[in-house]
């Protein structure tokens, strides 16, 4: 009787471990991301990280997936503190802010011209003023217009302008 209960308990434990939604992951393969820049040009979305990783795609989700595939490890998009949307002709802005890989607290900025994610990271870490992803999600759902702060400058010399 004790053996059958023990065997049943072991079988239940093994099944729970095999079918558990939690999977182990090698933390050394995670690539930290502080800043993400996304731009739309010539019909293609381009995502760049502060570490120099790039991804391209027909929509934001495809560009993020391409960046993940081409990276030497697993980019930790959820650790990004800043997201810069370059160029004003992005049609899929609402699709972008609802990507599950983005942390709700990530601050969003816009830029009239493409900026280098690596260059702008130190500046934004000192001068945080963006609108959070969660605030933008709420605005998209309610139809509220939100002005994003604009990053202006280049080559390590940046400033934050009032949103438009």
Set out the residue ranges of the language-model regions:
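Membrane-proximal alpha-helical signals and transmembrane carboxylates
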Residues: 1-164
């Amino acid at each position: 009787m004790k053996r059958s209960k023990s065997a049943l308990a072991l079988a239940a434990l093994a099944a729970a471990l095999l079918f558990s939604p939690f999977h182990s992951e090698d933390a050394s393969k995670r690539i930290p991301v502080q800043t993400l820049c996304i731009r739309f040009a010539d019909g293609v979305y381009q995502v760049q990280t502060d570490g120099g990783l790039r991804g391209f795609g027909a929509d934001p989700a495809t560009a993020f997936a391409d960046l993940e595939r081409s990276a030497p490890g697993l980019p930790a998009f959820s650790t990004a503190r800043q997201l810069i949307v370059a160029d004003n002709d992005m049609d899929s802005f609402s699709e972008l802010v609802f990507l599950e890989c983005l942390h709700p607290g990530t601050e969003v900025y816009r830029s009239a011209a493409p900026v280098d994610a690596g260059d702008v990271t130190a500046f934004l870490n000192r001068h945080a003023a963006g609108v959070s992803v969660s605030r933008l999600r709420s605005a998209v759902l309610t139809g509220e217009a939100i002005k994003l702060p604009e990053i202006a400058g280049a080559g390590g010399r940046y400033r934050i302008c009032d949103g438009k």
